[in-house]
Amino acid sequence: MPRSMKNDNFIDKTFTVMADLILKLMPGVSPEQKKAFAYYRDGMAAQSEGEYAEALENYREALALEQDDEDRSYILYNMGLIYQSNGELDKALEYYHQALELNPRLCSALNNIAVLLHHKGEQSLQAGDEETAEALFDEAAQYWIRAIRIAPNNYIEAQNWLKTTGRANLELY
């Protein structure tokens, strides 16, 4: 039974009913698109409740049905979030990169890649590998710069880090 049918939360049920009605009324929406949306919606619901295995299962189903690249990018991005939450950072990076291939302006994926690269840089620094750490920090900076160029009012903390570490590109500001 789909998650949307067994949820006891009134607000979630209301959202589900409204989303289903909107889908039914939208002209030109194929049955596959409707199924993809239902799986995506159920994946988001499961993810918000910490049911990551169920969320991934729903996202995989949505990904198999979804044809739109931008929609696919958000599915992949959410899968990356789950892997990041589970501490599977390399797998999270893979999914964020796949999302960016489909949607190069997905700022949240750019930011999350930068955050993970920065984290890996910190780990390398703690392990005494300054050369690897600096390379990872430089790579993180490039992703943050891309995100800031798209959304200049976001990522203030990243902008400050770029400035204080001398990695701020003057063209950025």
UniProtKB/Swiss-Prot annotation:
GO terms for cellular component: plasma membrane-derived thylakoid membrane. Disulfide bonds: none annotated. It comes from the Bacteria. GO terms for biological process: photosynthesis. Its main location: membrane. TPR repeats lie at residues 36-69, 73-106, 121-154. It is found in: Cellular thylakoid membrane. It is a peripheral membrane protein. Gene3D superfamilies: Tetratricopeptide repeat domain. SMART domains: TPR. Keywords: Membrane, Photosynthesis, Repeat, Thylakoid, TPR repeat. NCBIfam families: PRK02603.1 (NF002725). Essential for the assembly of the photosystem I (PSI) complex. May act as a chaperone-like factor to guide the assembly of the PSI subunits. PANTHER family: CELLULOSE SYNTHASE OPERON PROTEIN C, TPR-REPEAT-CONTAINING PROTEIN. HAMAP family: Ycf3 (MF_00439). Belongs to the Ycf3 family. This is Photosystem I assembly protein Ycf3. The gene is ycf3.
